[in-house]
């Protein structure tokens, strides 16, 4: 088996329906590590469910890997990878260093659980796009879909997102705040309560998603960027997940638009 230290922390570019050609940065690479354990996670069952921030990979290795990568072919640089990127304490430092190399836009995909922490918000504020996951309108659904680390509540997540929105405004940043909702059997009938939260947060954009990547029976570094044909390379059995029908997705999109008046994009094309 290849040692993780010999694998690049930078992967892709991979095609993303939301942002085009996306170069992935994996700040974790230490098994799958996240403050959530989503039932649909492309990494499979999360091996280290934690809220504790730490250094996983040195900034030096990440910048070195970045320089050796195909970053020039990417439309956007996305922090995602083998878990929750805000768990890495060098997230802010890596963003600053990459901004010295290129002016390509930077996106962070986060579950929002650590945004309550001012230091984490300071780390993400230099990104051009922050996409925050919000699948559940209450703690019961949060536990069912996202299975968070102990102590994470919907209230703390919403508070963190609102604080981030205020920071963006107060500091006059051009950072776009996107809320991403993964629709599952557990939340597809909770549109009104999700719309209520969206109206409180008032993000710049809402991205509607449904699990298009399979759920692997184990973690393998390749799962961080695997989709389409790549999923055949995952060494564990994979399970396709229940997705919404086009009709259901369109109904949800229309209803959310009617209830929120927000800018909405969807993985489902017409
Ligand atoms: S937040 Fe993302 S990385 Fe974490 S378990 Fe959910 S889908 Fe996986």
What are these regions (language model features)?
Residues 2-18, 29, 64, 187-270:
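Auxiliary Fe-S-binding modules of radical SAM enzymes
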Residues 4, 17-57:
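Canonical Radical SAM [4Fe-4S] cluster-binding loop centered on the CxxxCxxC motif
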Residues 27, 79-81, 181-183:
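Short glycine-centered, acidic/aromatic-flanked micro-motifs in structured strand/loop junctions
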Residues 38, 74, 127-128:
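Short, well-ordered alpha-helix to beta-strand connector turns
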Residues 44-79, 93:
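Conserved alpha-helical substructure of the radical SAM core
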Residues 51-54, 144-151, 222-223, 238-242:
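Short glycine-enriched, charge-decorated loop/helix-capping segments at active-site entrances
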Residues 73-74, 79-81, 98, 106-107:
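Glycine/small-residue-rich loop that forms an oxyanion/phosphate-binding "nest" at active or ligand-binding sites
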Residues 86-222:
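Conserved AdoMet/S-adenosylmethionine-binding subsite of the radical SAM
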């Amino acid at each position: 088996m290849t040692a993780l230290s010999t694998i690049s922390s930078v992967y892709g570019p991979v095609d993303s329906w939301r942002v085009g050609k996306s170069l992935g940065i994996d700040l974790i690479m230490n098994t799958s590590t996240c403050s959530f354990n989503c039932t649909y996670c492309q990494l499979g069952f999360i091996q280290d469910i934690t809220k504790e921030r730490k250094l996983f990979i040195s900034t030096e290795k990440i910048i070195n890997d970045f320089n050796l990568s195909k970053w020039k072919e990417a439309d956007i640089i996305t922090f995602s990878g083998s878990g929750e990127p805000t768990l890495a304490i060098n997230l802010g430092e890596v963003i600053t260093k990459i901004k010295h190399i290129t002016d390509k836009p930077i996106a962070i995909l986060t579950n929002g659980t650590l945004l309550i922490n001012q230091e984490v918000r300071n780390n993400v504020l230099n990104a051009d796009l922050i996409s925050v996951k919000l699948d559940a309108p209450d703690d019961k659904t949060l536990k069912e879909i996202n299975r968070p680390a102990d102590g994470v509540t919907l209230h703390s997540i919403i508070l963190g997102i609102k604080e981030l929105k205020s920071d963006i405004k107060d500091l006059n940043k051009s950072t776009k705040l996107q809320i991403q909702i993964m629709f599952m059997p557990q939340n597809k009938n909770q549109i009104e309560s999700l719309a209520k939260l969206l109206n409180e947060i008032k993000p710049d954009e809402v991205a509607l998603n449904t699990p298009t990547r399979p759920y692997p029976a184990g973690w393998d570094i390749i799962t961080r960027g695997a989709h389409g044909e790549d999923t055949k390379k995952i060494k564990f059995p994979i399970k396709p997940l229940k997705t919404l029908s086009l009709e259901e997705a369109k109904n949800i999109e229309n209803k959310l638009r009617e209830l929120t008046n927000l800018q909405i994009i969807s993985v489902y094309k017409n």
